[in-house]
């Protein structure tokens, strides 16, 4: 059985999320999975509706989120990441479908974010493992 993935990718910090997208696609292919649909959203905070749309589809086995939340002048990164992570988990449970977190942050610098682009690979691997095991 070929595993079909949906990607939800934040456009904010696109220099980072583009690298992450490429790594995620490459790793999906390596694992024998297919990226069936990709939805770009403005930022991590905007992901839940796109995730929900993909979770509703019968032809998508799991959803992979890709984003990067970088520390700013305020605690905004903390708020964004906490709410996004919670909603991602809620949607996974609501639809009984793996939704994995490929979003490093919060509290990291741009340099640290560059060092963590491999989170996309981790999220793809987690999605594939969960589909196979559940």
UniProtKB/Swiss-Prot annotation:
Any one GO cellular component localisation term in the record: riboflavin synthase complex
PANTHER family: 6,7-DIMETHYL-8-RIBITYLLUMAZINE SYNTHASE, 6,7-DIMETHYL-8-RIBITYLLUMAZINE SYNTHASE DMRL SYNTHASE LUMAZINE SYNTHASE
GO terms of molecular function: 6,7-dimethyl-8-ribityllumazine synthase activity
Protein name: 6,7-dimethyl-8-ribityllumazine synthase
BP GO terms, sorted: riboflavin biosynthetic process
InterPro entries documented for this protein: LS, LS/RS, LS/RS_sf
Annotated catalysed reactions: (2S)-2-hydroxy-3-oxobutyl phosphate + 5-amino-6-(D-ribitylamino)uracil = 6,7-dimethyl-8-(1-D-ribityl)lumazine + phosphate + 2 H2O + H(+)
Enzyme Commission identifier(s): 2.5.1.78
UniProt xrefs under Pfam families: DMRL_synthase (PF00885)
Binding site for 5-amino-6-(D-ribitylamino)uracil: 12, 44-46, 68-70, 101
Keywords: Riboflavin biosynthesis, Transferase
Active site: 76 (proton donor)
Annotated (2S)-2-hydroxy-3-oxobutyl phosphate binding sites: 73-74, 116
Role: Catalyzes the formation of 6,7-dimethyl-8-ribityllumazine by condensation of 5-amino-6-(D-ribitylamino)uracil with 3,4-dihydroxy-2-butanone 4-phosphate. This is the penultimate step in the biosynthesis of riboflavin.
Annotated source species: Methanosarcina acetivorans (strain ATCC 35395 / DSM 2834 / JCM 12185 / C2A)
UniProt pathway annotation: Cofactor biosynthesis; riboflavin biosynthesis; riboflavin from 2-hydroxy-3-oxobutyl phosphate and 5-amino-6-(D-ribitylamino)uracil: step 1/2
Homology family: Belongs to the DMRL synthase family.
């Amino acid at each position: 059985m070929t595993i079909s993935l949906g990607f939800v990718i934040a456009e904010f910090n696109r220099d980072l999320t583009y690298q992450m997208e490429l790594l995620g696609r490459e790793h999906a292919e390596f694992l024998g999975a297919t990226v069936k649909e990709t939805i770009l959203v403005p930022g991590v905070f905007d992901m839940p509706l796109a995730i929900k749309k993909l979770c509703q589809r019968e032809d998508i086995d799991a959803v992979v989120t890709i984003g990067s939340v970088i520390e700013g002048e305020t605690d905004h990164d903390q708020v964004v990441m906490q709410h996004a992570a919670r909603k991602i988990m809620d949607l996974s449970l609501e639809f009984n479908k793996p939704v994995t977190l490929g979003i490093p942050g919060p509290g990291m610098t741009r340099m640290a974010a560059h060092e963590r682009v491999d989170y996309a690979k981790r999220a793809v691997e987690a999605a594939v493992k969960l589909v196979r095991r559940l």
